[in-house]
């Protein structure tokens, strides 16, 4: 069954040494509110491994019930004159101590992307996660995601990558893909990186996506303490 959800993907700029405080504030205090008031589920709040990209930063991923669920979420947030949910005024005030802003995307999942519930049931989790942003030829995001399922995922599974989700970015020219995978250990991640240069199948995959993928950039993420994939519990 195709995944019917829509996702909000957030890159959060952290102030100083407040990443752990922000991640706890987001998961412990906002996660349950999002679920009960908006049916907005936290897939993950991860810390970016600074050596692999910008820091200090978190990556947040939220699951909603399709486009209508997202529309209801926006109405809930922006209906008032302050353009802010009144019940979250205190939450926002505290969060302002920990973050300075961010950059968000709306993501549409590939049909083979597991929902949060399915990911928990399958035991998808890792000591570390890979987060890949792929720039594709405009109009080719769906093509890339199909190729990913048919040709890359068998290789990825053999190497030790578990798919958390593969998504195309909405509200752009069908030109960006986000792929998040779980890796069981740091040692396994090191083996995967070594395979990029040495594994014949990896080289074949890169040649196959020439003309579809323009460029990509990967970074590493680690779980926050209350991450649902880590605990096996929806917030």
Predicted feature residues:
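Surface-exposed interaction/gating patches
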Residues: 2-21, 109-187, 225-230
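Catalytic micro-motifs at enzyme active sites that drive phosphoryl/nucleotidyl and oxygen chemistry
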Residues: 47-48, 118
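C-terminal/domain-terminus segments
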Residues: 233-235
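The conserved glycine-aromatic submotif of the RRM
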Residues: 51-59, 172-178
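An amphipathic, aromatic/His-enriched active-site/gating alpha helix that lines ligand/cofactor pockets
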Residues: 2, 20-44, 50-55, 63-107, ...
């Amino acid at each position: 069954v195709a995944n019917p959800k829509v996702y909000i993907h957030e890159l959060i700029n952290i102030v100083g040494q407040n990443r752990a405080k922000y991640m706890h504030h987001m998961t412990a205090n906002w996660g349950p509110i999002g679920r009960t008031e908006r049916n907005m589920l936290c897939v993950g709040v991860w810390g970016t491994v600074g050596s692999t990209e910008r820091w200090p930063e978190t990556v947040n991923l939220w699951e909603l019930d399709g486009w209508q669920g997202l529309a209801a979420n926006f109405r809930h947030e922006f209906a008032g004159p302050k353009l802010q949910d009144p019940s979250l005024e205190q939450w926002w005030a505290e969060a302002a101590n920990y973050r300075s802003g961010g950059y968000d995307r709306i993501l549409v999942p590939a049909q083979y992307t597991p929902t949060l519930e399915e990911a928990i049931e399958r035991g998808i989790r890792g000591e570390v996660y890979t987060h890949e942003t792929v720039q594709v030829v405009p109009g080719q995001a769906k093509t890339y995601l199909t190729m990913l399922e048919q040709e890359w995922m068998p290789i990825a599974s053999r190497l030790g990558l578990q798919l958390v989700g593969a998504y195309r970015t909405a509200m752009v020219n069908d030109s960006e893909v986000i792929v998040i995978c779980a890796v069981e250990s740091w040692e396994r991640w090191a083996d995967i990186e070594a395979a990029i240069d040495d594994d014949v199948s990896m080289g074949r995959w890169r040649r196959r996506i020439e003309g579809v993928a323009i460029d990509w950039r990967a970074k590493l993420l680690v779980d926050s303490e209350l991450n649902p994939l880590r605990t096996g519990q929806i917030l």
